[in-house]
């Protein structure tokens, strides 16, 4: 088992674990043995959660096991892939990809026959990412599926394998059908990560359906370029706060100082999510402006805002991130604590250990589950 070479880190982990778990060292127990006990303790938490009668907890166990990136949890993920609840199966499939591409490829072939349309679509999509020449025939068999989601997934998967002949299935999906169907086509097109397809998404920004514009902005994401700047600046003035905050996040992906003044102006927007998104975008642009917003948002009266703030802090390197996440870990709301726990895992580093270890005895099983998965991840780094 891999551990840090720094003796102070080992001692920190041991002391904190003993403090929170109530365990005691054996008379001649070595630090490595204690580390192994922490690993075993965390694995048991995940195993227990996967046996829960609560489907939400089982799903958390599958997702947390994937976040651990630990090969020793592949058997647990394979078991989760056969769960009766479709979200648990979906998280198991997504999680195993983070650990073993070969296992993920094998599992995606099997789950391409799943009864749930979302799981089936995700498995087909994964075959496009991980498959080889033999995967094409499996994917093509789903092009005539009665489920639009599956057809979209198949067309996208073939595109990733170099076959662009079915791209019209996705492009046609942008034009008609129900709004939900259009959102799906937009999402799959965005996940192809091909800049030559971005103009199709950009064209949707000129429409009059707020939801279509919102999902198009999300799909464009990091593929945004300077040519989009005028549209983004215009959308940042939109009456719909969802469009203001999503256009701000997209603007944050542009390189350089473009749009800084517009982002700074949104730091005083009437909507909390817009203010938060502007602050996130400014951090991504290496600007120190509006950093105080994170300290305000982590204490907002709306638990949804507190949760979103905690989640975003996992991706951002700001000076007081650890202190803000500590506040979120002690929040009375389970959703906020869950987001904070996962964010601490994303933050990583020696200082993440005591924060995560403290959550192994949280009052809610879902928080303990995510803490266990992320502790395992940190121990393997």
Annotated model-derived regions:
Residues 147-225, 240-245:
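Solenoidal tandem-repeat scaffolds enriched in leucines and small polar residues
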Residues 36-49, 70-82, 101-113, 132-144, ...:
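Amphipathic alpha-helical scaffolding segments comprising HEAT/armadillo-like alpha-solenoid repeats
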Residues 12-21:
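Bacterial N-terminal signal peptides
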Residues 25-71, 86-87:
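N-terminal leader/linker segments that initiate helical-solenoid repeat arrays
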Residues 64, 95-98, 126, 157, ...:
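Core register positions within helices of long alpha-helical scaffolds
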Residues 53-54, 84-85, 115-116, 146-147, ...:
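Short inter-helical turns and helix N-cap capping residues of alpha-solenoid HEAT/ARM repeat scaffolds
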């Amino acid at each position: 088992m891999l551990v840090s070479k720094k003796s102070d880190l080992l001692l920190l982990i041991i002391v904190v674990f003993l403090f929170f778990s109530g365990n005691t060292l054996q008379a001649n127990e070595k630090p490595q043995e204690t580390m192994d006990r922490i690993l075993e303790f965390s694995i048991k938490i995940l195993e227990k959660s996967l046996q829960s009668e609560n489907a939400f907890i089982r799903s958390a166990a599958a997702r947390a096991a994937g976040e651990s990136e630990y090969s020793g949890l592949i058997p647990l993920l394979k078991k989760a892939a056969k769960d009766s609840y479709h979200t648990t199966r979906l998280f198991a499939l997504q999680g195993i990809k983070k650990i073993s591409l070969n296992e993920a490829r094998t599992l995606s072939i099997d789950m391409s026959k799943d009864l749930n349309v979302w799981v089936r679509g995700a498995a087909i999509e994964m075959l496009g990412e991980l498959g080889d020449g033999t995967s094409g025939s499996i994917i093509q068999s789903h092009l005539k599926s009665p489920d639009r989601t599956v057809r979209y997934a198949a067309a996208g998967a073939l595109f990733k394998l170099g076959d662009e002949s079915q791209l019209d299935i996705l492009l046609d999906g942008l034009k008609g059908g129900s709004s939900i169907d259009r959102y799906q086509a937009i999402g799959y097109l965005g996940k192809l990560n091909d800049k030559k397809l971005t103009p199709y998404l950009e064209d949707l920004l000129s429409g009059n359906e707020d939801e279509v514009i919102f999902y198009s902005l999300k799909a464009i994401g990091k593929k945004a370029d300077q040519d989009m700047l005028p549209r983004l600046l215009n959308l940042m003035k939109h009456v719909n706060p969802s469009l203001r905050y999503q256009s701000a996040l997209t603007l944050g992906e542009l390189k350089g100082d473009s749009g800084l003044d517009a982002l700074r102006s949104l730091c005083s927007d009437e909507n909390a999510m817009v203010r938060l998104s502007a602050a996130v975008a400014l951090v991504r642009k290496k600007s120190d402006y509006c950093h105080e917003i994170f300290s305000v948002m982590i204490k907002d009266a709306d638990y949804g805002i507190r949760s979103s703030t905690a989640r975003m802090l996992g991706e951002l390197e700001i000076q007081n991130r650890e202190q803000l996440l500590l506040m979120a870990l002690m929040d009375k709301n389970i959703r906020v604590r869950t987001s904070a726990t996962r964010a601490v895992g994303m933050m990583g580093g020696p200082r993440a250990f005591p924060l995560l270890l403290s959550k192994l005895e949280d009052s809610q099983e879902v928080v303990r589950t995510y803490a266990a998965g992320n502790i395992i991840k940190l121990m393997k780094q």
